[in-house]
Amino acid sequence: MNLRRRGIVVSFHSNMVTVEDEETGERILCKLRGKFRLQNLKIYVGDRVEYTPDETGSGVIENVLHRKNLLTKPHVANVDQVILVVTVKMPETSTYIIDKFLVLAEKNELETVMVINKMDLYDEDDLRKVRELEEIYSGLYPIVKTSAKTGMGIEELKEYLKGKISTMAGLSGVGKSSLLNAINPGLKLRVSEVSEKLQRGRHTTTTAQLLKFDFGGYVVDTPGFANLEINDIEPEELKHYFKEFGDKQCFFSDCNHVDEPECGVKEAVENGEIAESRYENYVKMFYELLGRRKK
């Protein structure tokens, strides 16, 4: 008799794993079969697994099913999309940080929804910065403007979240936890105030966990990241993660769009088809990666 069931990993507790049964929705505390340690097999939040329940109400994870993807920073499996939360103050998210997040999402073949949060706090100068972000990114990614305090944009954001596994991304202090509380009050996530002096929130989550929305779908709430590493990307690979570069015609088929002549990307920047900030951030990342490789 096959007692194995299937579920999804929603959280970790020391050496135990919480699995949500895919049929019943029941959450089972499971330990790992010995082969995971012996074969150094890894398991992550978002993994779909086979487990065997026991008579005590706990279970044992037998196998990890095929992963469609795996994010490494943070470690999350089978993600459908990234919800990138940015703010123009307290803290300000630079376009360079935004573009690093987007490069990582593109590398992992993930859809991205950009959320400009804390709209209730912005004065006219801040709103000008919001419009600048919209000008740069609206043709590339969906943008939702939100306020957890007033409810602005919350229903629109819910539509993007329904039925999918999403991961929140963004600097600490941009209001990821507050947004999730506004989207689904039952989540009851802790919220930290942003220090005005540091303009950087204290992390309110310490390990990744999968949270289930009442309206369907999951989200992984993970710590905000001040530093984003793209070290495993080759300099020549980087251009593929700036989606607006793809259809530009260059004289050289292997053009890196930096110092080559007759470059379609540089021409597109000059005539306004590609945002200057996007290109400048690309060049900065390219040389960072090139310098790291030479060390």
UniProtKB/Swiss-Prot annotation:
Residues annotated as domain CP-type G? 68-228
Q: Enumerate the cofactors the protein uses.
A: Zn(2+)
Its annotated compartments are: Cytoplasm
Q: Which EC main class describes this enzyme?
A: hydrolase
Which GO MF terms does the UniProt record name?
Answer: GTP binding; GTPase activity; metal ion binding; rRNA binding
Q: Which Pfam families match?
A: RsgA_GTPase, RsgA_N
Q: Which residues of the sequence carry a binding annotation for Zn(2+)?
A: 250, 255, 257, 263
Keyword Acetylation in the entry? The reply is no
**Origin, by domain of life?**
Bacteria
Q: Where does it primarily localize?
A: cytoplasm
Q: What is its EC number?
A: 3.6.1.-
Where does this protein hold GTP?
Answer: 117-120, 170-178
> Does this UniProt record's set of keywords contain Ion transport?
no
The note describing how and how many cofactors are bound reads: Binds 1 zinc ion per subunit.
| Biological processes annotated in GO | ribosomal small subunit biogenesis
Task: Identify the keywords attached in UniProt to this record, alphabetized.
Answer: Cytoplasm, GTP-binding, Hydrolase, Metal-binding, Nucleotide-binding, Ribosome biogenesis, RNA-binding, rRNA-binding, Zinc
List cellular component terms (GO). Answer: cytoplasm
State the similarity comment. Answer: Belongs to the TRAFAC class YlqF/YawG GTPase family. RsgA subfamily.
PANTHER family found in the cross-reference section: SMALL RIBOSOMAL SUBUNIT BIOGENESIS GTPASE RSGA, SMALL RIBOSOMAL SUBUNIT BIOGENESIS GTPASE RSGA 1, MITOCHONDRIAL-RELATED
The record's note on quaternary structure and interaction partners says:
Monomer. Associates with 30S ribosomal subunit, binds 16S rRNA.
Q: So what does this one do?
A: One of several proteins that assist in the late maturation steps of the functional core of the 30S ribosomal subunit. Helps release RbfA from mature subunits. May play a role in the assembly of ribosomal proteins into the subunit. Circularly permuted GTPase that catalyzes slow GTP hydrolysis, GTPase activity is stimulated by the 30S ribosomal subunit.
Q: What is this protein called?
A: Small ribosomal subunit biogenesis GTPase RsgA
Species this protein is from:
Thermotoga maritima (strain ATCC 43589 / DSM 3109 / JCM 10099 / NBRC 100826 / MSB8)
